Amino acid sequence: MKFLLLFLVVLPIMGVFGKKNGYAVDSSGKAPECLLSNYCNNECTKVHYADKGYCCLLSCYCFGLNDDKKVLEISDTRKSYCDTTIIN
């Protein structure tokens, strides 16, 4: 019974504090273009306050963005490709 109560309390909190992945956009609604992953990691972590980032399909893809950050709307196929690409 205690486990069920704990589950019911923790589950909504996890959704609130969850983070998202995607192409973070600036005030003009454009994602930064790139050729190098190092540039994207700096762009994502220092400008958009994400956990990390890399260059995926010529745009900076960020991991661990806050829920209030705007991201570029992309297809599910492209999102799953960038989510599963291995980062060194």
Swiss-Prot record:
Signal peptide as annotated in the record? 1-18
**SUPFAM superfamilies reported for this sequence:** Scorpion toxin-like (SSF57095)
Predominantly, its location class is secreted
Q: Which GO terms describe its molecular function?
A: sodium channel inhibitor activity; toxin activity
Q: Name one GO cellular component term.
A: extracellular region
Please list the coiled coil stretches: none
Q: Where in the cell is it found?
A: Secreted
Summarizing the function annotation, the protein's role is: Excitatory insect beta-toxins induce a spastic paralysis. They bind voltage-independently at site-4 of sodium channels (Nav) and shift the voltage of activation toward more negative potentials thereby affecting sodium channel activation and promoting spontaneous and repetitive firing. This toxin is active only on insects.
Name the record gives this protein: Beta-insect excitatory toxin 1
Q: Which organism is it from?
A: Androctonus australis (Sahara scorpion)
